Amino acid sequence: MTTTLITGANKGLGHETARRLIAAGHTVYVGARDIERGRAAAAGLGARFVQLDVTDDASVAAAAATIEAEGGLDVLVNNAGIEVRSPEGEIIGAADLTADVMREVFETNVFGVVRVTHAFLPLLERSAAPVVVNVSSSLASLAQAGKGYPGAAYPASKTTVNMLTVQFAKAFPRMRINSVEPGYTATDLNQHAGVQTVEQGAEIIVRMAQVGPDGPTGGYFDASGPLSW
């Protein structure tokens, strides 16, 4: 039995990924900050729930202790992410970017990935086939920079996630650690402006969560295959 933790899994891409992996036979932990929403999502999916705020050391440590006590972990999906907008709801470009905005975005999108991954590495190292999937974005690609999206902090955070993916993959060659680009998916993150459904967006996350020990590692993929960044 494969045991999987998905951060930010009470809605959107995380929720759909949980649904699909449960259907594939995984035991899934829905990680969510909000206890009520997380428990409701887990109950609806037939998943387990663990309270998990990726910005809080104590919350992450408690989640790791819970999952360790209940049997361990094979797959980690770092899905939780945010985009910070202006009080008027506008995307914040470089001209209006402040250190506070950058810090807020990085706290979840970058430091959250590091915090969670670091906490769960001891559990993953005990797995026979450990996998980490970091949910990135096409906006992480330097080749795509400047094409349509004017924001500064969110793309920078996802580019950082891609580099972290490479470095973690080098450090832990037995693990399959990859970044994925789900596509512009209609979720709360973009006020449901995305052109894809969550079913379409979750496709590459689900695929890479099931990659075998002989599969790729240290890569960046969308549903069509490897991407340059």
Residue ranges of model-derived segments:
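Canonical Rossmann dinucleotide-binding motif of NAD(H)/NADP(H)-dependent dehydrogenases/reductases
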Residues: M1-Y29
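Structural signature of the Rossmann-like NAD(P)-dependent dehydrogenase/reductase core
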Residues: I6-T7, N78-N79, P130-S137, R176-E181
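Conserved glycine-rich Rossmann-like NAD(P)H-binding loop of the short-chain dehydrogenase/reductase
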Residues: A24-A40
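The beta1-alpha1 cofactor-binding region of Rossmann-like NAD(H)/NADP(H)-dependent oxidoreductases
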Residues: I35, Q51-A63
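A glycine-rich helix->loop->beta "capping" turn
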Residues: T66-N78, V84, T98
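Catalytic loop of short-chain dehydrogenase/reductase
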Residues: I82-S86, E90-F106, V114, H118, ...
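C-terminal helical subdomain
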Residues: T159, S179-P182, Q191-W229
